[in-house]
Amino acid sequence: MWVRTVCFCFFSYLFAGEIGAAIPADFIFHDKPVDALCFFNMEGNEIDLNQCGLAKENYVMKGQNSKLIAEGFIGYNWQDPEFSDSAQGYSYYKFFNAGEKLYWLYTLNSGGGTGVFTAIHLVKRKKADILNLETLAGGDRCNGGLQNVSESNHHLIFSQNLTAYDLIALSKEPDPRVKAYDDLAACAICCVAKAYYKVDSNAQLKFDYVDLGTIADTKEMPNQGALQSCFNQLFISYIAAGNSKLTQNTLNEFAAKFKQTCTKLN
């Protein structure tokens, strides 16, 4: 009991003053910012703020990531005291005003393992102790993990990590014969590109483009899957030709070339 009480007071102290004054009332609960753990392992589209957070989980606070705090995130690192030798987890969020009492919420969570779970939600305060929440996008590292989140002209802009399988799946006519893992890399550490999106306050998600990056050698790419080697050669050829930014049309062309060149090898 003493440990939990001290940590809770420490938590309150860290979020008092300047940070509390900077966030909207919709993210204040019991005179403190909404607990970041409320946005981890959620079920349904409502959050009861009385039934979530550090105290409800019986976790202890283990400090903060100063870099994330400096970037405007709210949250902390935590640990389950029943497993004091285990790695620490963390929960952070950053809000963006979507207008009309709506907010885009970018969340970062880890349970202490290798997973890094990121998501974007559209959030509204329904009652004093209830948040409504709609998840717009999310994933774990290369399996749909989110980065580069910012607000511009009343839209939220972000990137989503893609595996080779995800990249082909984004095209208008992906080959249904191509299977994740068996044919193309789809693991959580198999990133090859980023897809960029825009979203408005009506939760309309719009694909913008894919950035293939600057990889110059197939040795730097994943090798999981029977068709991955052929995919890698096609991928590198696009970058070498200066075609690293793919709109929907050029992405469709890439997928068509992959189908023509690589799937016949299977």
Question: Positions of the model-derived regions?
Answer:
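Short N-terminal edge-element motif at the start of the domain
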Residues: 57-141
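Sequence-level detector for tyrosine residue identity
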Residues: 13, 59, 76, 90-93, ...
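Acidic, small-residue rich beta-repeat scaffolds with periodic aromatic anchors
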Residues: 19-55, 145-266
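Intrinsically disordered, low-complexity segments enriched in small/polar residues
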Residues: 15-18, 42, 51, 61, ...
